[in-house]
């Protein structure tokens, strides 16, 4: 927040407030638009955090969220196994591990090889098609992000953002749709990609 304030604090239409997203210092029905990008899945309960946020939305107000999508089952298993260890690391230790994952991702990426899966493997959550080797490993087996523009620091940061936070929940589109229904929000847009789910809804 200090970085953001230094760069944009002089603008009259922007206000920076640092607070617990589950204990916000605002009255109910305060905002006409709420935007929460890649935040809710890092709270202790994504669904209840979302429900809490909607209390601050005025009638006919909009809310937009992005949450992590659930991955293939082996990737989910490995994520949980590794994260049980990385969340207990110091910042320095997890940074080093995140560098290891970036180097691994880079090594796989530099192969410049494709793999073709002739048909779906439902038990593994693998879809048929032709994949870059690094992308295939990344989406189906292990988070080892590598930025194709060779931005090493960004690659380390993306890996760190996955492995260090105490909470990093993944969800399905069905789950997210239910949150909106339960909060009496009508979904106006929904986009699901491998990494996550983006949804915007309006309060009825």
Placement of each model-derived feature along the sequence:
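Conserved SAM-binding loop
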Residues: 4-5
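Short conserved AdoMet
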Residues: 9, 44, 58
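Conserved SAM-binding strand-loop segment of SAM-dependent methyltransferases
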Residues: 10-23
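A short acidic, Gly/Pro-enriched loop at the edge of an enzyme's catalytic core
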Residues: 22-34
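A short SAM/SAH-binding and catalytic strip from SAM-dependent methyltransferases
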Residues: 32-45
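A short glycine-rich, Lys/Arg-flanked "PGG" loop and its adjoining helix->strand segment in the class I
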Residues: 47-62
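Conserved class I S-adenosyl-L-methionine
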Residues: 62-116, 129-136
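C-terminal lobe and adjacent flexible extensions of AdoMet/dcAdoMet transferase-like proteins
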Residues: 133-204
């Amino acid at each position: 927040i200090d970085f953001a304030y230094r760069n944009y604090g002089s603008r009259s239409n922007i206000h920076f407030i640092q607070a617990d997203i589950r204990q916000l210092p605002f009255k109910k029905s305060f905002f006409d638009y709420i935007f929460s990008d890649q935040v809710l899945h890092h709270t202790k309960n994504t669904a209840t955090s979302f429900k809490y946020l909607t209390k601050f939305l005025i009638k006919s107000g909009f809310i937009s969220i992005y949450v992590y999508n659930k991955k293939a089952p082996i990737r989910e298993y490995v994520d949980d196994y590794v994260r049980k260890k990385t969340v207990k690391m110091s910042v320095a230790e997890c940074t080093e591990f995140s560098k290891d994952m970036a180097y691994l991702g880079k090594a796989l990426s530099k192969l410049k090889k494709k793999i073709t899966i002739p048909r779906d493997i439902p038990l593994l959550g693998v879809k048929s098609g032709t994949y870059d080797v690094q992308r295939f490993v990344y989406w189906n087996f292990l988070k080892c992000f590598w930025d194709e523009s060779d931005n090493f620091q960004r690659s380390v940061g993306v890996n760190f953002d996955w492995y260090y936070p105490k909470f990093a929940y993944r969800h399905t589109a069905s789950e997210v749709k239910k949150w909106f229904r339960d909060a009496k929000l009508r979904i106006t847009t929904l986009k699901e990609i491998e990494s996550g789910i983006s949804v915007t809804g309006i309060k009825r």
